Regions:
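N-terminal accessory/pre-domain segments preceding catalytic cores
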Residues: 1-118, 122, 165, 196, ...
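Hydrophobic/aromatic-rich core segments of domains that either
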Residues: 103-123, 132-142, 147-239
Length: 402
């Protein structure tokens, strides 16, 4: 944890929050430790934009969960710090939501085993938030609750916050762009029974590892998650962007290959530090699903689905591109300056989307399906009055502007 402490001190000096050490000094030792780790893993912008009370509340609530909730106690420290303690999921506005969500669900979850508790949390999420397209801005978890709707990125951010508030390690997973159709999608992974499982946020099912997107996920070229802090041991890392680490989750959903690329200069020497974009055709543009920087040997690699890709590399004003078929694993050699894009002519290309079919989805039993149907009927019957009443009760506990 020495590196985290050094990172905290560096960002403290960078942001100039002189009152923060005094606030931490007034906390119990373990709460202060968690708060410092939380700050250390957060972008400097969050230090400046987010009231300290949000970070301190997250630390105090995470400590309570660690000491009092069985599934939180069982988590390895890296998972607890990155996926329970930390307030940030993606690029949403941060707010002090964890105590609010826990207060709403504590009694409802009492006595439930892990998986049943996760499913119950997702039912609660569905009772309060439904899918509706919005703009590209991601609202805070409490703002989504107040509105009662959100796009998939907001639903998944909301559900991750609710799961973390109840002591589960949870994260948002994201397909930057589909290869077989336009647009993208985000959903949730939760740590349950010692393994990661997926679910559609605010889309309750009778079992985990089941959602409308099962087949689509099996056709993804890339599925990734974000980690603020240290990723779990053994994670397949794509790269780091500031304080966020991108982890590759594709192999959990689709048939994959390890595609390697070697970048050289015009003299055949390895080109270190060149960015390689792995691009997917979507919405009439080549979208960089992932960008990997070459190492000292000029090599870059990505675990990806079995679909066509456009590779684009650039360094020092020079570039090169190539198209790879689903069967290719490389190494694909790209020579900087040898083949720059030529917009003055048309070239035919043939692209293939992944076939899909690899998602290991669960199949509910007959009793599970019956229970799910009964719960959904009950929810639909009570929606108009019960949801309004519950939402009103929760909003009374919110003391901060949204």
């Amino acid at each position: 944890m020495r590196s985290r402490e050094a990172e905290f001190e560096r960002k403290l000096a960078q942001t100039g929050l002189r009152q923060l050490p005094d606030l931490l000094q007034a906390l119990p030792d373990e709460t202060a430790r968690l708060a410092r780790l939380c700050y250390a893993a957060s972008p400097a912008g969050d230090w400046l934009d987010t009231p300290p009370e949000v970070f301190l509340s997250c630390a105090a609530h995470a400590r309570y969960l660690r000491e009092n909730v069985s599934w939180t106690r069982a988590l390895p420290e890296p998972l607890f710090l990155a996926y329970v303690l930390h307030p940030r999921v993606n690029n949403e506005a941060l707010c002090d939501c964890r105590p609010v969500f826990y207060a709403a669900l504590a009694e409802r979850l009492r006595g439930l085993p892990e998986e049943a508790a996760v499913l119950e949390i997702n039912r609660w999420c569905a009772e309060h938030v439904a899918y509706q397209p919005t703009d590209e801005r991601t609202r805070s978890a409490l703002a989504v609750l107040r509105a009662g709707f959100g796009r998939c990125g907001e639903e998944s951010m909301f559900a991750v916050n609710v799961l973390r508030a109840c002591g589960f390690a949870a994260r948002q997973v994201y397909v930057p762009r589909w290869a077989h159709c336009d647009d993208n999608h985000a959903w949730v992974e939760v740590r349950c029974g010692g393994a990661w499982h997926f679910l559609g946020a605010c889309e309750p099912e009778a079992v985990l590892d089941r959602g409308w997107f099962n087949s689509a996920a099996g056709r993804a070229v890339l599925v990734h998650s974000r980690c603020f802090g240290e990723p779990e041991p053994g994670a397949d890392l794509i790269g780091r962007e500031g304080d966020v680490v991108y982890c590759n989750e594709t192999a959990r959903y689709a048939d994959v290959r390890r595609l390697t690329v070697r970048v050289t200069d015009e003299n055949g020497m390895s080109a270190a530090g060149a960015n390689v974009d792995f691009c997917v055709l979507n919405n009439c543009e080549w979208y960089p699903a992932a960008t990997v920087q070459t190492d000292a040997s000029g090599m870059a690699a990505l675990t990806c689905g079995l679909g066509s890709l456009r590779l684009l590399t650039r360094r020092d004003g020079l570039c090169c591109e190539a198209f790879v078929s689903p069967e290719e694993t490389g190494p694909v050699v790209l020579t900087l300056g040898k083949r720059a894009p030529a917009p003055d002519r048309w070239e035919p290309i043939e692209l293939t989307a992944p076939r899909g079919g690899a998602v290991r989805g669960a199949v509910p039993t007959e009793p599970q399906r019956d229970l799910q149907e009964r719960l959904l009927r009950q929810y639909m019957h009570n929606t108009e009055n019960a949801v309004t009443m519950r939402l009103s009760t929760i909003l009374k506990t919110i003391k901060q502007p949204l």
